């Protein structure tokens, strides 16, 4: 998270992501071009292709309850409520990319900036091999402990709920299409996520049963 503008100020990736799709549902070509040149290895194009592939799943755990009046299960949350719960971190959610039944699914964890894909693993190993002194954390992380310098950017941010410190991953050192694609969806604005949901390119699935939730994790591990 070292990217800076011409005046030396930090770029707010979340703000850029939120402007990628305008209010008319059209791609903002100016913002898209800027993001294309911002990320190496054609990461932005690969992330957009991933979003358009219809292979990205967002699972949300909403524990089932019972309506005391008629003893009936509570209804599923509306899509807008699910989207808000993801942005508020009020419900557990899991991000999984699964191209086909034969392919191994890719597990993505934005909160801890981790991905199970080979590209992410290779970059992590490369950083480990390049280290001469110090720790991996000092090489990959940037801490901001001065509240006057706190940023609104949520992209590649860890410990997002801390009141005393902001911690970011140096995304120019450790990034992959899966992390970037989900960041565009979940570290921008609810309107951006709603746009791709309405186009049917992102699958948002509510899970009410804890057993099904645990099976989901087991399947990813397998």
UniProtKB/Swiss-Prot annotation:
- GO process terms (BP): DNA recombination; DNA repair
Where does this protein come from, organism-wise?
Answer: Zygosaccharomyces rouxii (strain ATCC 2623 / CBS 732 / NBRC 1130 / NCYC 568 / NRRL Y-229)
One GO cellular component term of this record is:
nucleus
What gene name does this entry carry? SHU2
The alphabetized UniProt keywords are:
DNA damage, DNA recombination, DNA repair, Nucleus
> Where does the UniProt annotation locate this protein?
Nucleus
Q: What does this protein do?
A: Plays a role in a RAD51/RAD54-dependent homologous recombination repair (HRR) pathway to repair MMS-induced lesions during S-phase. Required for error-free repair of spontaneous and induced DNA lesions to protect the genome from mutation.
| Similarity annotation | Belongs to the SHU2 family.
Instruction: Report what the protein is called.
Output: Suppressor of hydroxyurea sensitivity protein 2
